[in-house]
Swiss-Prot record:
A motif (Involved in PIP2 interaction) lies at residues 81-97. It is found in: Cytoplasm, Cytoskeleton. Occurs in many kinds of cells as a complex with monomeric actin in a 1:1 ratio. Belongs to the profilin family. It comes from the Eukaryota. The variability of the residues taking part of IgE-binding epitopes might be responsible of the difference in cross-reactivity among olive pollen cultivars, and between distantly related pollen species, leading to a variable range of allergy reactions among atopic patients. GO terms for biological process: nuclear migration; regulation of actin cytoskeleton organization. The modification Phosphothreonine is found at residue 111. Phosphorylated by MAP kinases. Disulfide bonds join 13-115. It comes from Zea mays. This is Profilin-6.
Length: 131
């Protein structure tokens, strides 16, 4: 299965009639493995800061999580495993695997819990596959 298939069929899938606004799988080096068409263009340092927060939990809390043109307020997550952010009625979930970051961005009517479920389910699967 290609990385694009994981994005198209597993991250952008429909959940209770809703789906993520955009999603991507990005290597720890910041290289995009696959992304949805609406995934924002980001700066290398934005991905570096996300990785740093996994290594140093709480790093992003005072400055926010930036991805492309959007700044997310970092909210509860799982230190070293999941970062969650909020912006208005939407937000972001980032799950770290051994080699990649699984990223999902949502807006209402999708809920934070639905986004977390979609992103973390694929992330957990990739971890079990050694990826």
């Amino acid at each position: 299965m290609s990385w694009q298939t994981y994005v198209d069929e597993h991250l952008m899938c429909e959940i209770e009639g809703h789906h993520l606004s955009s999603a991507a799988i990005v290597g720890h080096d910041g290289a995009v493995w696959a992304q949805s068409t609406a995934f924002p263009q980001f700066k290398p340092e934005e991905m570096t800061n996300i990785i740093k927060d996994f290594d140093e939990p709480g790093f992003l809390a005072p400055i926010g999580l930036f991805l492309g043109p959007t700044k997310y307020m970092v909210i509860q997550g799982e230190p070293g495993a999941v970062i969650r952010g909020k912006k208005g009625s939407g937000g972001i979930t980032v799950k770290k695997t051994g080699q990649a970051l699984v990223i999902g961005i949502y807006d209402e009517p999708m809920t934070p819990g639905q986004c977390n479920m979609v992103v973390e389910r694929l992330g957990d699967y990739l971890v079990k596959q050694g990826l």
